[in-house]
Regions:
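Substrate-binding pocket helix/loop in short-chain dehydrogenase/reductase
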Residues: 7-8, 12-20
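Hydrophobic alpha-helical topogenic segments used for membrane insertion/localization
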Residues: 208-235
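Active-site helix of classical SDR
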Residues: 31, 67
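SDR active-site lid
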Residues: 83-176
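Active-site loop immediately N-terminal to the catalytic Tyr-X3-Lys motif
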Residues: 8, 58-63
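Residue(s) in the substrate-gating loop at a strand-loop-helix junction
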Residues: 51
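A short helix-coil junction within the Rossmann-fold of NAD(P)-dependent oxidoreductases
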Residues: 33-42
């Protein structure tokens, strides 16, 4: 998928619309093309790489979040439509943050250089999961402990999760290097970032920004963990 980062009103409307076109409508159109063939042959596998963004919203990436939440809803509805076809499988992948050039390609209207949030996963791991699903279709596959944690945290404490995430992002942007606004690969192709990996895992903790973001995320995750534990204890006392 593609990402446009920034305060909502600072991002041109056509950029946000292209995010929806790529991340949501692209999947819908693809399904419309292949499903008649699947139904004719009575079997098939449709794999949607949604990302943890389908469960956990991204402040300063509102259109991206809309596309991912929308894609999750589309996929869930489609599974209902296909209950009469037990051998047609709709399989959703929810990986966490990956070491790809996606951030390099992103439209960026924050005025600052942005980086993926740690811990950063391997794209090869996701590729292996896709192969696994082809041989053993699963309706939902969450990849990585971080993705699983964020999903649970947002389901239990949505307001706290949003507040912590937004605070961490704002803290990072205050000290990040300034750069000019760019539409990235949203409106036009780019000739950079053509490798499989983005190189983020190797360089991240070497930078001050990386260390600060890691510290902020660690504090945020600790807060969410405490909230989860307290919520669990309260429910146990009331049960």
């Amino acid at each position: 998928g593609v990402l446009a980062a920034g305060v909502l009103e600072d991002i041109p409307a056509e950029v946000n619309e292209e995010v929806i076109q790529t991340n949501l409508l692209g999947y819908i159109r693809s399904a419309q093309v292949v499903l008649p063939w699947f139904k004719q042959q009575k079997h098939g596998i449709l794999i949607n790489n949604i990302s943890v963004g389908g469960w956990f919203p991204v402040p300063y990436g509102a259109a991206y979040s809309a596309s991912k939440f929308g894609l999750r809803g589309f996929s869930e509805a489609l599974k209902g439509e296909l209950t009469q076809y037990p051998d047609i499988h709709v399989c959703d992948l929810y990986p966490g943050f990956l070491d790809t050039p996606g951030i390099q390609h992103a439209a960026n209207y924050t005025g600052k250089a942005i980086k993926p949030a740690p811990p950063i996963g391997s794209p090869q791991k996701v590729a292996r999961k896709v192969v696994d699903i082809i041989y053993d279709p699963q309706a939902t596959t969450t990849i990585g402990a971080t993705a699983s944690f964020l999903k649970i945290a947002y389901n239990l404490f949505p307001a706290l999760s949003r507040a912590i995430t937004a605070s961490v992002i704002r803290t990072y942007l205050k000290q990040a290097n300034p750069i000019p606004a760019t539409s990235g690969n949203i409106l036009d192709p780019v000739d950079y970032g053509t490798s499989i990996e983005g190189g983020w895992r190797k360089s991240f903790i070497k930078t001050l920004g990386g260390k600060m973001l890691i510290a902020g995320l660690a504090a945020g995750l600790a807060g969410l963990t405490m909230g989860l534990m307290m919520g669990s204890r309260i429910r146990n006392l009331l049960s």
